[in-house]
């Protein structure tokens, strides 16, 4: 797929880094921020080792790191539920003429869902409800415009990620965790304006 992308799109992809840890320096020592940054640089979820180091250094986030770990471990089923929700809400979206056709477009959408949850888990693990980069989001908006990504479907998918994730948590955790999801939903929803 990358061979089919224009140079402009490739540049936007490189700049569409939606997480920022700049404000975290006041809460976490540089070695902990570096763990978050390395995970994001590598496009991966925090490892067990990362989560343990974070919880050891900041014991008050131990429950949050455990939740981030659980969501990471269940990402495939969470993304699958969100995908099913998008397909139920937009039944023709993967058909010819639909916003996620051809299949490579749909695969990119589901991959974005995986990355959205990855970014959300960083916020949860670090107990930072505002974890996005305005600059990265701006470039993501330009990228989505350039690729004509169906924003309605992406917002429905992100809401599905929230629903699927929260149902895997204890009910009393929902109120605490919802803002991490709502933050990114609000940011993505603003792309439509």
What are these regions (language model features)?
Residues 1-149, 154-155, 166-193:
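Core of compact, soluble alpha-helical bundle domains
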